């Protein structure tokens, strides 16, 4: 059986989120891990852009989860073994969880540091918690852990999609195109 495509709405949400999550992840990584502390102006600028675009992920993942809760995804092609089907669905669930927890912990962290969370240069998200010098770094660690886990799974997801297309030459990637 050739796989059927996902409907337009989940395909658009998938690619829109990819177009936001990948640069947001890279900006956070560069600002947090590559730039030296002495480059505070550049770090501040990159983290500002990171927050602007990453905050929209909260809205998009809620829309995506709502769609997923009310619509069944198409079946994978018959050529995909059962163990890979189970693994794909389990990893998809974990990725959904991380796409929710990563921006939420970022939002919580910003709130705990007393910073506003801008959304696409048009507004701000309300603080989720009050300022807390004690909680902010702990939430920051949770945000970093969640972001790293999401980054690893995203990389694996991309590699798996490319292996399906160019290695196995099946129609799995076509489902989301």
Positions of PLM-derived features:
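Membrane-embedded alpha-helical bundles that constitute the cytochrome b-like, heme-associated redox core
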Residues: 1-177
């Amino acid at each position: 059986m050739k796989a059927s495509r996902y409907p337009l709405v989940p395909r658009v949400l998938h690619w829109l989120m990819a177009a936001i999550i990948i640069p947001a992840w890279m900006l956070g990584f560069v600002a947090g891990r590559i730039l030296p502390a002495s480059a505070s102006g550049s770090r501040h600028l990159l983290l500002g852009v990171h927050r602007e675009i990453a905050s929209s992920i909260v809205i998009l993942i809620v829309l995506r989860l709502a769609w997923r809760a009310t619509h069944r995804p198409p079946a994978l092609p018959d050529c995909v073994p059962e163990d890979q089907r189970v693994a794909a669905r389990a990893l998809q669930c974990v990725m959904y969880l991380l796409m929710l927890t990563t921006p939420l912990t970022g939002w919580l962290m910003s709130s705990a540091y007393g910073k506003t969370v801008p959304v696409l240069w048009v507004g701000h998200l309300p603080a989720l918690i009050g300022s807390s010098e004690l909680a902010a770094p702990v939430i920051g660690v949770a945000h970093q852990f969640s972001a790293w886990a999401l980054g690893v799974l995203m990389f694996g997801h991309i590699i798996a999609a490319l292996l399906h297309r160019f290695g196995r030459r099946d129609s799995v990637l076509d489902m989301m195109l």
